[in-house]
A protein has these predicted regions:
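Catalytic core of nucleotide-sugar-dependent glycosyltransferases
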Residues: 121, 134-160
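Short, conserved alpha-helical segments within structured domains
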Residues: 77, 100, 142, 160-167
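A broad, low-amplitude sensor of folded, mature protein cores
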Residues: 60, 104, 126, 146, ...
Length: 182
């Protein structure tokens, strides 16, 4: 982040890709016309070998207060922020091995209430796998870190409600993926 040179910062994982050559142009246009500090969108998980096979469809929505406490989080690879947001919010916390993206976005949206725009379209194809990609131990570790993030950032959460909503969201994502493949 410190060595980046642009006014808008986004991350693209090494194995992932934009759904079109115009994604960055479209995102830049939104920053210009909507006067916001953050833009995020939808994401689809694709099979790591057969990228035509959709595994999960992460449909986002407008961020509202308490979304995070109810199991919602925007897909982190779709998030673009103005550089100055990092000055207000801080960088990613390296003490979060599995859920640094969650903890960071918790600060962005719940603590600092950064003015954002939800782009209602899929802009990223993300290959399955990764550090939290399905291994039960890493999922458990991620969930422990998420609870720690709520506590350290003083955001109240009802554990059982959070995990129930998160599970329902995952089921909906897989159902959307199944319907996309029909």
């Amino acid at each position: 982040i410190e060595i980046s040179t642009g006014k808008i910062i986004g991350f693209l994982n090494s194995d992932d890709y934009y759904t079109s050559a115009y994604v960055l142009e479209h995102v830049a246009q939104i920053f210009e016309t909507e006067n916001v500090d953050a833009v995020y969108a939808d994401l689809i998980y694709v099979d790591e070998i057969n990228t035509a096979r959709v595994v999960r469809y992460w449909k986002s929505k407008k961020v509202e207060l308490l979304n995070f406490s109810c199991g919602f989080i925007p897909p982190h690879p779709t998030l673009f922020l103005r550089r100055e947001v990092y000055g207000r919010v801080g960088n990613f916390n390296p003490n979060y091995r599995f859920s640094g993206d969650f903890e960071f976005m918790l600060r962005v949206f719940e603590i600092h209430k950064v003015h954002s725009f939800y782009l209602d379209e899929t802009i990223i194809k993300m290959r399955t796998g990764g550090a939290t990609g399905g291994n039960l131990v890493s999922i458990k570790d991620q969930n422990i870190e998420i609870l720690r993030a709520f506590k350290e950032n003083k955001v109240e959460v009802v554990k059982y409600l959070y995990f129930t909503c998160k599970a329902i969201n995952r089921i909906k994502q897989r159902l959307r993926a199944f319907l996309c493949m029909l």
